[in-house]
Design a protein with these regions (language model features):
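Conserved ABC ATPase signature
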Residues: 85-89, 93
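H-loop (His-switch) and adjacent beta-strand-loop-beta switch element
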Residues: 158-168
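A short, proline-enriched helix->beta-strand linker immediately N-terminal to the Walker B motif
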Residues: 104-108
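Catalytic Walker B motif of ABC-type/P-loop ATPase nucleotide-binding domains
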Residues: 110-113
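H-loop/switch region of ABC-family ATPase nucleotide-binding domains
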Residues: 145-146
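Helix N-cap at the start of a conserved alpha-helix in ABC-type nucleotide-binding domains
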Residues: 121-123
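Conserved ABC ATPase "signature" region
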Residues: 4, 8, 15, 62-80
Length: 168
């Protein structure tokens, strides 16, 4: 992960798998993912969405998780949204909350699955602006997107899929 070599083995079906469960859990704790449809918990406020994983996964105190969450909400331009519920927000705002949630885990790599495809066209720019800022910070991101201009602008390596084939 991000230059760190992990021990892998080949299972009976020929797939590469982690050699042990602890290694796999450690690997997963260093990744965050932002989904196409945000995957925010609708019954929780924005702040509650952001502090849940750091508390459960890392055993972080609520105060520390809250401080971290507020820092990342400010980074995505939503510092005044912590008491809102996702259903009261635009798609672009929800996606920025999802990005802030990913950042609260302070991952080495962030995976983005079509982060703008479920958004109205006028909301795409606000999400791309946040992602551009992350790229400028030097964050490692793997992005699946149809926003080709954006991908060319922020990437140092592109892989194209065309007719289910990889084109480098």
């Amino acid at each position: 992960l991000n230059g760190d070599v992990r021990n892998l083995k080949v299972n009976k079906s020929g797939e590469l798998v982690a050699s042990d469960a602890k290694q796999l859990q450690h690997f997963r704790s260093r990744l965050s993912m932002v989904f196409q449809h945000f995957n925010l918990w609708q019954h929780m406020t924005v702040l509650e969405n952001l502090i849940e994983a750091p508390i459960r996964v890392f055993g972080m105190s609520k105060a520390e998780a809250t401080e971290r969450a507020r820092q990342y909400l400010a980074k995505v331009g939503l510092q005044n949204a912590e008491d809102k519920y996702p259903s009261s927000m635009s798609g672009g705002q929800q996606q920025r909350v999802a990005i802030a949630r990913a950042l609260t885990m302070e991952p080495e790599v962030i995976l983005f699955d079509e982060p703008t495809s479920a958004l109205d066209p006028e909301l795409v720019g606000e999400v791309l602006k946040v992602m551009r800022a992350l790229a400028e910070e030097g964050r490692t991101m793997v992005i699946v997107t149809h926003e080709m201009g954006f991908a060319r602008e922020v990437s140092n390596h592109l892989i194209f899929f065309h007719k289910s084939m990889i084109e480098v």
